[in-house]
């Protein structure tokens, strides 16, 4: 199909790792690949696709804590409190998926009613993993 048209073709659907990406590129010869849900909780997927030396298995809970903190700082800066809290709950749940004690931390963030609650939970999470 790609060979019969003169416009860029973008592949899409169920691309959650480099192997999926390579399969769709090889099978379709598309010009690009769209990544959606696979990036939720895994912003590292883009590094995995572009850096042959990156191994997603090397990621650990410290990386998750760091990304939660960075993401929260940006949400506080650019979003009003209600939106910040809702997005924090959504994204932190994705980030924590699959890690030890994930449900405990997810519950703490989901119960947050203010920016201060999130800050306290983030500090507790950092302390528990960095000490």
Give the label of every model feature segment.
Residues 2-11, 15-131:
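Alpha/beta catalytic cores of nucleotide-metabolism and tRNA/nucleoside-modifying enzymes
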